[in-house]
Design a protein with these regions (language model features):
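N-terminal secretory signal peptides
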Residues: 1-13
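N-terminal cap/lid segment of alpha/beta-hydrolase-fold proteins
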Residues: 41-79
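Short beta-strand element of the alpha/beta-hydrolase
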Residues: 84-91
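Cap/lid segment of the alpha/beta-hydrolase catalytic domain
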Residues: 120-143, 253-258
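Short beta-strand/loop motif that positions the catalytic acidic residue
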Residues: 214-216
């Protein structure tokens, strides 16, 4: 698996570039996570929250990165005894926004082990403003993030409740881009599910061999439909099994019930499709 700096020799957008252009402004807005409470969905409107499911065990974990530093993450698994396929969850900004732990828990409720590695561990504790967070992120490249994710995969391999075999990956925004990159570079990935993926080079996409299922909204202000169709075209041209689902009127982050863009019907349908896809390719 190519995870070093030499992986960025091709033309395209690495993490540093992605966070310095127009996408940076969008990402800064998304990482602020300070929404008017009146615009957020009410508990009655949230149809995808499963954090209180008594059949799911979940919480923070810490694992080694290259035998040196440690990385934290959020892990969820079924409470029942057994071994279960593993799925990596890649956040677009922070793993503490509740819908990310909830995604892990939803995977566990469906019979998987979900792990969200904290690829944003470089953020200093005192980074409180969007600009401080953006500047801290600039020091962390795509290659760094992929190494963090690989450390998470290695950690999962040591757990007695994780089934041997291929791993799935679900990513959001920048995490969707990283999900595509994993599908391109890792032989361990058997299913890739990007939600409104960030800019990914055509050369990177052209190497993806794993089955891919993409979810995005027709009203996404940061990932236009044309961009999604280009990804679809490139994947299908090389024979990668590909499914693309576009949700009418859905904006960026429509699965995130912690944001005003949450779209319950689209979120529920997208998650049903995601689980079916993962079951098909990981079991």
């Amino acid at each position: 698996m190519c995870l070093g700096d030499d992986c960025n020799n091709e033309k395209g957008t690495d993490r540093r570039t992605f966070l310095t252009g127009a996408a940076a402004a969008a990402l800064v807005g998304l990482t602020a996570l300070e929404y008017d409470a009146q615009t957020l969905p009410t508990r009655d409107q949230i149809v995808t929250r499963v954090l209180d499911d008594p059949n799911v065990q979940h919480g923070k974990v810490v694992f080694k990165h290259g035998g040196k530093e440690t990385i934290d993450g959020y892990l969820a698994r079924p409470k029942a005894a057994g071994v279960f396929p593993a799925v990596i969850v890649i956040a677009g900004n922070v793993i503490t926004e509740e819908y990310i732990p909830n995604t892990c828990a939803a995977l566990a409720a469906a019979g998987f082990v979900g792990l969200a590695p904290n690829i944003f561990h470089i953020l200093p504790d005192n980074a409180r403003t969007p600009e401080e967070r953006r500047l801290a992120n600039l020091a962390h490249t795509d290659a760094d993030a992929l190494q963090d994710i690989q450390a998470g995969i290695d950690y999962l391999r040591t757990q007695p409740f994780v089934k041997n075999g291929g791993v799935g990956v679900v990513g959001f925004c920048y995490g969707g881009k990283l999900a595509m990159m994993l599908g391109s570079r890792s032989r361990e990935i058997d299913a890739v599910v990007p939600f409104h993926p960030g800019p990914t080079s055509a050369a990177e996409i052209s190497r993806v061999k794993s089955p891919v299922q993409i979810h995005s909204g027709t009203a996404d202000r940061h990932v236009p439909v044309a961009s999604v169709r280009e990804i679809e075209k490139t994947l299908k041209a090389q024979g990668a099994p590909t499914e693309v689902f576009l949700y009418e009127g859905a904006d960026h982050g429509f699965l995130a019930y912690t944001r005003p863009y949450y779209k319950p019907d689209a979120a529920k349908l997208a998650w049903t499709r995601t689980v079916e896809f993962l079951r098909r390719h990981l079991k």
